Amino acid sequence: MLIGLTGTPGTGKTSVSKLLEKKRQWKIIHLNELIKEEHLYTEVDEKRDSVVADMELVRSRLPELINEMEKEPANKVVILESHLAHYITDIVIVLRAYPPELKKRLEKRGYSEEKVNENAEAESIDLILAEAFEWCDKVFEINTTGRTAEETAGDVEKIIDSLLSGKEEQLQEYGPGSLDWIDSVP
């Protein structure tokens, strides 16, 4: 089963996915790293200190990689971790964070003020959640505000375990749309 773990930068995707990889031995594709390592991008955006992913190249590369991971007998889950994961997977978990807290997280990373504000605004207007609705069949939402990566990983596990066991009805608390941070837009 391929699951996307997406969200605005700073919501905890990488920390959570690393915990799940260690605890559950689920395979993780850190998409942003893959894009950079395999040059699956069209250009370097110097201003944003990032690359512009070539989604066609990404989509053509992933099936082979995922098939290899799924061949391992004990592996039932592959997690695609990236703020772009919702463009690729049919099932996605969107990690969210209250924008003022998100700003603090991104400032600690040393992001420029412009990049911090751009990401906080994107989170305020539910940008990735809205895109996930457009691209994905199943969307779940987890609030990471004031929570540890371990706590958030527990929620991700619950969602994935429920999906694997066909008990999706147990996931109402993760239904998208419960978080509204529009008031945090400056």
UniProtKB/Swiss-Prot annotation:
Has keyword Mitochondrion? no
Q: Which reaction does it catalyse?
A: AMP + ATP = 2 ADP; ATP + H2O = ADP + phosphate + H(+)
Positions of the region NMP?
30-53
Query: What superkingdom does the record give?
Result: Archaea
Tell me the keywords, alphabetical order.
Answer: ATP-binding, Kinase, Nucleotide-binding, Ribosome biogenesis, rRNA processing, Transferase
Q: Where does ATP bind?
A: 10, 12-15, 109
The cross-references to InterPro entries, in alphabetical order and at most eight, read: Adenyl_kinase_AK6, P-loop_NTPase
What EC number(s) does this enzyme carry?
A: 2.7.4.3
Q: Name one GO biological process term.
A: rRNA processing
The entry lists its GO molecular-function terms as: adenylate kinase activity; ATP binding; ATP hydrolysis activity
Q: What class of enzyme is it?
A: transferase
Q: Where is this region: LID?
A: 108-118
One Pfam entry for this protein is AAA_18
Q: How does it assemble?
A: Interacts with uS11. Not a structural component of 40S pre-ribosomes, but transiently interacts with them by binding to uS11.
Q: Which family does it belong to?
A: Belongs to the adenylate kinase family. AK6 subfamily.
Q: What does this protein do?
A: Broad-specificity nucleoside monophosphate (NMP) kinase that catalyzes the reversible transfer of the terminal phosphate group between nucleoside triphosphates and monophosphates. Also has ATPase activity. Involved in the late maturation steps of the 30S ribosomal particles, specifically 16S rRNA maturation. While NMP activity is not required for ribosome maturation, ATPase activity is. Associates transiently with small ribosomal subunit protein uS11. ATP hydrolysis breaks the interaction with uS11.
Q: What is this protein called?
A: Putative adenylate kinase
Its source organism is: Methanosarcina acetivorans (strain ATCC 35395 / DSM 2834 / JCM 12185 / C2A)
